[in-house]
């Protein structure tokens, strides 16, 4: 357990909530990159970007609450916004998924509002990748498209009884 390792390294025999939080973030996002020197303009950009995610999450509300916003680099990220679900669910509504996509674009929107269209950065690349993947899943596998309706569009037909081809 990563939390126990952190407590032991600190010379403690009990695991604290801070140990568990740090362990969870380390596993999810990677270790803190404390030695990374971040220029002031980049810190400012990261701060606005992450707060953009937080603001969209706060305004949208819904099932995930903003738990933490940080500019401390971890893994490949310059900072991150951690949202936690209020309850665990096996299935997600279309609204929930669209809200999550909006949250992913909150960082890019903040960059554009604060710094202008010509000064947006590559910092949103992972956000765009994840949001695009979610949107593709919604349309091609989950039948959540207004245009196509409840159909499977990814080319597989696992449910075909006779595996016949459709021409």
State where each predicted segment sits.
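Soluble catalytic regions of large protease machineries
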Residues: 43-48, 54-167
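Inter-lobe coupling/hinge segments of SF2-like helicase ATPases
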Residues: 12-14
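Residues within well-ordered alpha-helical secondary structure of globular protein domains
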Residues: 2, 26-29, 57, 137
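Short, conserved phosphate-binding/catalytic loop or strand-edge motifs used
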Residues: 21-26, 75-77
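C-terminal helical "lid" of AAA+/P-loop NTPase domains
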Residues: 1-9, 21-22
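Hydrophobic alpha-helical transmembrane segments of multi-pass inner membrane proteins, especially
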Residues: 6-9, 26-33
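Short pre-active-site segment immediately N-terminal to the catalytic Zn-binding motif
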Residues: 35-45
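Structural motif detector for alpha-helix initiation sites
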Residues: 16-17, 94
């Amino acid at each position: 357990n990563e939390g126990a390792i952190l407590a032991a390294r600190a010379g403690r025999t009990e695991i604290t909530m801070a140990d568990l939080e740090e362990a969870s973030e380390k596993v999810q996002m990677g270790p803190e990159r404390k030695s990374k020197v971040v220029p002031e303009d980049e810190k400012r950009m990261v701060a606005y970007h992450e707060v953009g995610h937080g603001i969209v999450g706060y305004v949208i509300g819904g099932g995930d609450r903003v738990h933490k916003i940080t500019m401390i680099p971890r893994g490949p990220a310059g900072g991150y916004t951690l949202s936690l679900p209020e309850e665990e669910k096996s299935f997600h509504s279309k609204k929930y998924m669209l809200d999550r996509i909006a949250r992913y674009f909150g960082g890019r929107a903040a960059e554009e509002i604060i710094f202008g269209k010509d000064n947006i950065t590559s910092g949103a690349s992972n956000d765009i990748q994840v949001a695009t993947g979610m949107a593709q899943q919604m349309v091609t596998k989950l039948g959540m498209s207004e245009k196509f309706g409840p159909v499977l569009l990814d080319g597989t037909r696992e449910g075909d009884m006779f595996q016949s081809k459709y021409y």
